[in-house]
């Protein structure tokens, strides 16, 4: 059985100089929950992270390649890879494999470089778009609705974290395949922070 994290909820949003990523922690294999503490936000560098939704093996391959691309760029160019360039390289991998064995993934790449904070959405076809906010996974209709209703470009960092949390926790309450708590990552000027909010607190806040 191929393990999947497509039945999930991940969100990302940009506010000022920060990007906030959030995801639930449950992973499924068919109708079964096989893990309740999965990290669906993978650190690529100290200034970039990738959320994953899709087949676990495919997502892990993309994450490892993204890390390699970022390290290679830093060695060759002597500085951090621009987030747009990293998104383009990841989308190229997706599109190259599309004709042979496509990666079953949806990805959100969030990060900060010399141009500021940014968020990119990529699908299995290799298409890439820059977004102010986005959601992926089975809980995305609920999460996106929350983001669309409440997002503002001038949100404070705390407001942005709360909105990301509310988007995922709302999806957890309505989507049987999302759950087990919320991971939140914040990337900003000199900052890469991670925190986990347990399921009990998630339910109490809803």
Swiss-Prot record:
Domain of life according to the entry: Archaea
Subunit structure: The 20S proteasome core is composed of 14 alpha and 14 beta subunits that assemble into four stacked heptameric rings, resulting in a barrel-shaped structure. The two inner rings, each composed of seven catalytic beta subunits, are sandwiched by two outer rings, each composed of seven alpha subunits. The catalytic chamber with the active sites is on the inside of the barrel. Has a gated structure, the ends of the cylinder being occluded by the N-termini of the alpha-subunits. Is capped at one or both ends by the proteasome regulatory ATPase, PAN.
Catalytic-site annotation from UniProt: 8
Disulfide bonds: none
HAMAP family xref list: Proteasome_B_A
Recorded GO MF terms: threonine-type endopeptidase activity
Ways its activity is controlled: The formation of the proteasomal ATPase PAN-20S proteasome complex, via the docking of the C-termini of PAN into the intersubunit pockets in the alpha-rings, triggers opening of the gate for substrate entry. Interconversion between the open-gate and close-gate conformations leads to a dynamic regulation of the 20S proteasome proteolysis activity.
Keyword Hydrolase: yes
Protein name: Proteasome subunit beta 2
Subcellular location: Cytoplasm
Catalytically driven reaction(s): Cleavage of peptide bonds with very broad specificity
Family, per entry: Belongs to the peptidase T1B family.
Pro-peptide positions on chain: 1-7
The organism of origin for this protein: Desulfurococcus amylolyticus (strain DSM 18924 / JCM 16383 / VKM B-2413 / 1221n) (Desulfurococcus kamchatkensis)
CC terms in the record's Gene Ontology section: cytoplasm; proteasome core complex, beta-subunit complex
Functional note: Component of the proteasome core, a large protease complex with broad specificity involved in protein degradation.
